[in-house]
């Protein structure tokens, strides 16, 4: 049977100080990205659970994340009414998209030239879908066109 042939061992990953909100593997499956209410997205080695790094800059719970196809950029959505674009390798914040309500979901489009971000209803505002153009040059600061 399958359960007899697969030898699974649990890996305990310690690092977040508040509850987790989202998990995402990269395409190769060797990295795991986690989001939590502690404001700090984190990247882990998937095979041993070792923390590789964190992405510091949000001031609220981080609800979600997505990776570019080449795994060079990470986008995160937060309760701090922003979505942030990061350099995966260095952890550098590349750009911040600001909104009038919390960013609840983020996703890169095929080709990584567009990102879609949804925002929650907030006070008198309704929920919204925002499509943002992403620069192909990671050093270019003008991510919005």
Predicted regions span which residues?
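Short C-terminal beta-strands that terminate individual repeats in beta-propeller domains
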Residues: 2, 9-15, 35, 51-57, ...
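WD40-repeat beta-propellers
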Residues: 41-46, 65, 83-87, 106, ...
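Intrinsically disordered, low-complexity acidic/Ser/Thr/Pro-rich linker and tail segments
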Residues: 1-22, 30-31, 42, 120
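Solenoidal tandem-repeat scaffolds enriched in leucines and small polar residues
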Residues: 105-145
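Loop/turn segments within WD40 beta-propeller blades
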Residues: 24-29, 66-71, 107-113
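WD40/WD-repeat beta-propeller blade-loop signature
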Residues: 9, 16-19, 28, 51, ...
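Structural hallmark of WD40 beta-propellers
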Residues: 30-33, 42, 51-53, 71-75, ...
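Conserved strand-to-loop turn within each blade of WD40 beta-propeller repeats
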Residues: 28, 35-38, 45, 77-80, ...
């Amino acid at each position: 049977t399958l359960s007899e042939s697969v030898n699974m061992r649990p890996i305990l990953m310690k690092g977040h100080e508040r509850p987790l909100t989202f998990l995402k593997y990269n395409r190769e499956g060797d990295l795991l990205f986690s989001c939590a209410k502690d404001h700090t997205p984190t990247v882990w080695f998937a095979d041993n659970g070792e923390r590789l790094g964190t992405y510091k800059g949000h001031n609220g719970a981080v609800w979600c994340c997505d990776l570019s196809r080449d795994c060079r950029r990470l986008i995160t959505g937060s309760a701090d009414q922003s979505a942030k674009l990061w350099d995966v390798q260095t952890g550098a914040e590349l750009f911040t998209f600001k909104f009038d309500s919390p960013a609840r979901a983020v996703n890169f489009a095929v080709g990584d030239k567009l990102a879609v971000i949804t925002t929650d209803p907030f006070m008198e505002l309704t929920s919204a879908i925002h499509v943002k153009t992403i620069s192909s040059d990671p050093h270019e600061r003008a991510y919005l066109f």
